[in-house]
């Protein structure tokens, strides 16, 4: 098998196995068997299981981040250089939600791998998430342009909470379905996106809670 085909076969088999069984339960020997290659080929191309996981995650994350930045660029062009805050949040979380949610039969191995990466915290993925933040800096800058009078710290929290809502929805989708007895439709990705964007915008732009210090909020809620 040519070298590039061997590499592709390993990546494809690993992605499928990790998506289906999780990171801890899949061994390099499982991947070797599924890819129909020898262990030396995995060691030659990737060096270790962690490096293999890292390459898969980087490849898929780069595709998502490109889509995010393309949507952000379009929103800023539409706004004459200053995107509306709702359009910024939509570009931030939309690609992830559309890639990971929806009917099961529409989910590719790539999408299921990214869902697994969101559910399971493993060292190579944590390291990449903590290191690769340049695209998020661009979103933070867009938020500052959109809301120039807003405290920068609040904008960072707003960005963080929007991402947290999206990832929590992906991680615990089955629990939400059970809790709501099926009334919350996780196949309605557009509706989920609208809800996350709406809450994110509200947190930054509206209401008494935005202006009141945390200590005063606690005192008020205790009454």
For the regions a protein language model found, what residue spans apply to each?
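Helix-turn-helix
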Residues: 9, 17, 21-59
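Hydrophobic/aromatic residues within well-ordered alpha-helical segments
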Residues: 49, 56, 60, 64, ...
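Conserved phosphoryl-transfer catalytic core
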Residues: 51, 60-75
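Hydrophobic alpha-helical connector segments
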Residues: 69-108
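C-terminal peripheral helix-coil segments that are non-catalytic and often amphipathic
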Residues: 87, 98, 102, 133-223
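Amphipathic alpha-helical segments used for helix-helix packing
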Residues: 87-91, 102-133, 173-178
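Short alpha-helical scaffolding segments that buttress acidic/His motifs in well-ordered protein cores
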Residues: 92, 96, 111-118, 162, ...
């Amino acid at each position: 098998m040519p070298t590039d085909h061997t590499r592709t076969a390993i990546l494809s088999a690993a992605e499928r196995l990790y998506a289906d069984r999780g990171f801890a339960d899949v061994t390099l020997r499982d991947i070797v068997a599924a890819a129909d290659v020898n262990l030396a080929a995995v060691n030659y191309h990737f060096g270790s299981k962690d490096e293999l996981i890292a390459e898969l995650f980087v490849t898929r994350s780069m595709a998502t981040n490109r889509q995010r930045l393309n949507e952000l660029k379009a929103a800023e062009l539409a706004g004459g250089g200053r995107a509306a805050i709702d359009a910024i949040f939509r570009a931030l979380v939309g690609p992830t939600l559309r890639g990971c949610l929806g009917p099961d039969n529409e989910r590719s191995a790539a999408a299921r791998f990214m869902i697994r990466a969101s559910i399971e915290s493993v060292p190579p993925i944590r390291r990449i998430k903590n290191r690769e933040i340049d695209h998020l800096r661009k979103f933070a800058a867009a938020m500052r342009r959109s809301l120039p009078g807003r405290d920068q710290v609040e904008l960072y929290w707003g960005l963080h909470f929007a991402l947290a809502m999206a990832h929590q929805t992906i991680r615990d989708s089955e629990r939400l379905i059970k809790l709501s007895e099926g009334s919350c439709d996780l196949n309605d990705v557009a509706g989920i996106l609208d809800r996350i964007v709406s809450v994110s915008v509200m947190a930054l732009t509206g209401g008494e809670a935005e202006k009141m210090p945390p200590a005063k909020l606690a005192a008020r809620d205790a009454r």
